């Protein structure tokens, strides 16, 4: 049995947000941006469930923290968050 793993990348440093092409390459397809209540963003593969990508436990935990156990995140994910001073990643 082959173990399939997912990647979770967190970015907090200002000026380091990925380009569209970099985000697409990381998630492996079209990107979907999820706005989280703490003013951060989660970038995921828009068609991840259709492609039967594996569960991403870290991204799913982040989803559950903000929205409860209403969904699961699959495939690679990027979390764009603000740093401790509240500065953004743009």
Give the residues covered by each predicted segment.
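Short beta-rich binding modules
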Residues: 1-90
């Amino acid at each position: 049995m082959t173990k399939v793993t997912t990647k979770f990348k967190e970015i907090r440093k200002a000026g380091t947000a990925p380009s569209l092409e970099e985000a697409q390459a990381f998630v492996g397809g079209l990107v979907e941006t999820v706005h989280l209540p703490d003013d951060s963003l989660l970038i995921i593969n828009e068609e991840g469930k259709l492609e039967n990508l594996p569960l991403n436990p870290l991204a799913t935990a982040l989803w559950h923290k903000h929205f409860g156990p209403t969904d699961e995140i699959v495939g690679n994910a990027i979390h764009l968050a603000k740093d401790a001073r509240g500065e953004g990643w743009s």
